[in-house]
Amino acid sequence: MTLLEGSVGVEDLVLLEPLEQESLIRNLQLRYEKKEIYTYIGNVLVSVNPYQQLPIYDLEFVAKYRDYTFYELKPHIYALANMAYQSLRDRDRDQCILITGESGAGKTEASKLVMSYVAAVCGKGEQVNSVKEQLLQSNPVLEAFGNAKTIRNNNSSRFGKYMDIEFDFKGFPLGGVITNYLLEKSRVVKQLEGERNFHIFYQLLAGADAQLLKALKLERDTGGYAYLNPDTSRVDGMDDDANFKVLQSAMTVIGFSDEEIRQVLEVAALVLKLGNVELINEFQANGVPASGIRDGRGVQEIGELVGLNSVELERALCSRTMETAKEKVVTTLNVIQAQYARDALAKNIYSRLFNWLVNRINESIKVGTGEKRKVMGVLDIYGFEILEDNSFEQFVINYCNEKLQQVFIEMTLKEEQEEYKREGIPWVKVEYFDNGIICNLIEHNQRGILAMLDEECLRPGVVSDSTFLAKLNQLFSKHSHYESKVTQNAQRQYDHSMGLSCFRICHYAGKVTYNVNSFIDKNNDLLFRDLSQAMWKARHPLLRSLFPEGDPKQASLKRPPTAGAQFKSSVTTLMKNLYSKNPNYIRCIKPNEHQQRGHFSFELVSVQAQYLGLLENVRVRRAGYAYRQAYGSFLERYRLLSRSTWPRWNGGDQEGVEKVLGELSMSSEELAFGKTKIFIRSPKTLFYLEEQRRLRLQQLATLIQKTYRGWRCRTHYQLMRKSQIVISSWFRGNMQKKHYRKMKASALLIQAFVRGWKARKNYRKYFRSGAALILSNFIYKSMVQKFLLGLKNDLPSPSILDKKWPSAPYKYFNTANHELQRLFHQWKCKKFRDQLSPKQVEVLREKLCASELFKGKKASYPQSVPIPFHGDYIGLQRNPKLQKLKGGEEGPILMAETVVKVNRGNAKTSSRILLLTKGHVIITDMKNPQAKTVIPLNSLAGVSVTSFKDGLFSLHLSEISSVGSKGEFLLVSEHVIELLTKICRATLDATQMQLPVTVTEEFSVKFKEGSLTVKVIQGPGGGGTGKLSFKKKGSRCLEVTVQ
């Protein structure tokens, strides 16, 4: 049973029954499998990463959720964003949206969805749209430079981001401020197996054109850079080439100039090239170990790229200057130290470039002073991380998550308590785990782990990670949330998973083991002064600005604050900022470790739900009353349960709610009436209300159906009755009208006859007998004479092509007019024929024969109509040698041309000469005129030809023919229309019989060995050229393709 009809599982976990960890996870799983990834815990949104694009984020959904309140539609991130925005705009309360969860749980995507929704609903206008576009386009820039592929997430944020979006009093965006936290700069020089460096390096190499790569002195192959993992250069579902173009467009929209974009890419290229600087062992003259650069070309290219003296850079990488108030001492660095210096420089350049980018974006989107602003903060910060090898970065990341969990617990309880106080409802204390003891363990000013780390970094003498661990073991040996090998041994606990250089903290999310190796180094975060000064001397404006401490005039011997101290200060500031705003929570959950769509790991989600405190959050929400709703909304939903409030209620909302609940006889212990809301203690009571509402809806539906059916039947009856009356009246009227018209026509006819009879009777005495016939004949002859004289004057031209003919003036002349037209056309044709010479007559007869044979049957016929039939296409009359081919044959040569003979055995072709006389068809070889075949026309049984534009045809012989011992002939002619026309006419003249011509795409040719089936098909070109290609298909089939 659910709160809303048709929902999947329970949409609000506050209403879950029974309330247990397993049922909570099962409900999330059920909804996830139905692609319902959002679930509420009161006003907290739980989001399970679907690892796929869902069709629930288009403009239709934006419009839907902006018009409804939080609980009126299905759970959605737009509902939470809309609630936060409306609270900011209408109630003037600053908001913050806290997005938390593991790496890969979808926090970055959630923050982008929140920003896109707010941008879509917060007003329009040229200036407003410009501000919204700049805020949205900051995401691609920060993702390119701050996100990377990790083992668990292909687009993991490796920095923390908090954005304050500022609005005016109308809710229109004015600008914003971005704050970043602890970029994971160690990733610049080293990544775990299966991980990538920051996206920008791969986008630059994949998306930059050849000219830009040449200017940056880079090559496209990622395998040529020491700082990039070659095995993971590509990521499924990520197009680095396209993303680079998106990055360039985003930087332009934000306000970066072309020169600034070029300088940013040059600094990124400098980091890549620094990784390829290879250092080797060298020794000074006194035998002291030193270092040098194997190939100076790389350093030289770096110098050319950023305007840096390569000699000074090499000196800064391979030596160090120790400076006190009185003297300077230069010491050489061995290879390990030089490599450390090179990597430290690369990390610092990239980290400072990232900070510069954030500041540059802030300059573009910042709001002018003097305006009153409302603020909505969106926090997208690294999720809780538990890796196989956890170092300093994981320690501070998890510390930040501890602080956020503390904020969540305190502000959730605070909000719940304040709502009860506002409504006058007694508050019931809820037991929950307070992680303040863990936060205090890490951040205490005198005895916290961070304080001990700073103290160890500043302590004179030999300082190492092991001395730091020893101090922690001494201070926290009895702390309930701290463990190490030493403390376990003291308590006689034996854990083989705990290393000697490790300590463990029992976080709210679970136990995490940290390896102290490099803690001191990463906390110091020192960069040798020689390297800062070398970078400051570069002629590159951006690179120079990143190292202000390199300026000798601003040189200071004061030690900079440690990384841990800076991060602790930033987190403290962030917490103060969050406490000053109204919180909105999005708890992101990763459903599986392999980023697979549709796969839900019950165990993994259980662990996340446990450390996110989802069950405790539900219990807090249900501490006093599981469900609460404004009187107006509650009455609107349930007023149908009382006859007093249904269908109309004119009283107050609270009074109406009391009427409804009073008639249901519900226990007073289950209800509490606040000032503006009704509170219900247990979900069972709410489910009872929903069940009663469902039953009542069925009753009302039945009533509505009954009423509707009755109304429809009455309406139909009334309409039919009205229609019958209208039809009857029209029918009767029409019948009367027809009867009246018939009676009137009859009366007029009788009157006409009577008047005629009377007129004839009265005037008969004045006329002679037969006068009418004489007059009518005279009139008719006059009309005929007029028609013929008019026709004589309007006769068309004597051209047989002119089809015009004047129409008859009267209908009874139509027959005569058509006959005259026919006679005139015959006369014109005779006159035309009398003018023709015998040769022209013969030509036209051949064309007429061709038309009868091929018109509408062969595609090449229309092209042959305007072309005269020449007959001789080989120059027979001018070549005596060719005339000998005729032999003893008498009479003229009707047709002479070169044809192609198709070999029946291998489908190969060869040229032949074909002669047509009045009695024979002669086929002979051009090279051997003696080898000829003479076919009498009376031996021909028929001709087969295709309907395409080709010249292929077959001469079929009669069965009694003695000619062609090898069989019938398959030939190709360029003048097939003319040739076959002449053969048919010659055969008719010689045998007085018509030669059959078959137009078909498949015919049989008989040979000595048997028959061969010829199949003609049209090629992909549509047969426009008429070219043929032959292909043998077995021994009995030949396939011909017309190109």
UniProtKB/Swiss-Prot annotation:
Amino acids binding ATP: G101, E102, S103, G104, A105, G106, K107, T108
| All residue ranges annotated as the Myosin motor domain in the record | 8-694
Looking at the record, the residues that make up the IQ domain are 697-719, 720-742, 743-772
Gene Ontology CC: one annotated term: brush border
Q: Where is this region: Actin-binding?
A: 571-593
Coiled coil ranges: none
Q: Which UniProt keywords apply?
A: Actin-binding, ATP-binding, Calmodulin-binding, Motor protein, Myosin, Nucleotide-binding, Phosphoprotein, Repeat
Domain named TH1: residues: 858-1042
Query: Single Gene Ontology BP term?
Result: actin filament-based movement
Name the job this protein performs: Involved in directing the movement of organelles along actin filaments.
Q: Which family does it belong to?
A: Belongs to the TRAFAC class myosin-kinesin ATPase superfamily. Myosin family.
User: What PANTHER family has UniProt attached to this entry?
Assistant: MYOSIN, UNCONVENTIONAL MYOSIN-IA
Query: What name is this protein filed under?
Result: Unconventional myosin-Ia
Gene (name only): MYO1A
